[in-house]
Amino acid sequence: MEENKLNELMSITAEECAELTQVCMKVVRFGMNNDYKPKRPWLIEEAGDVLCMLKFMVENELVTWEELEERADYKRNKLMK
């Protein structure tokens, strides 16, 4: 992958992760539902955007689904302790 495409992919991925972080913190502060704005649709939107970027990483052979699943399993097991 050429450097400018890699930089673009990494930049957009970082931005999408930041947006997911923002909605997660809004849920922590205000709950999933309040009078101002329900958070579930926003959470779905931002989590989906991050998933899209992970798919781009796989398509561009930066990571594999197997590697991601292995890491996810490791993290899940660690959190379950």
Predicted regions and their residues:
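Flexible "arm" and connector segments at domain edges
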Residues: 1-47, 51-81
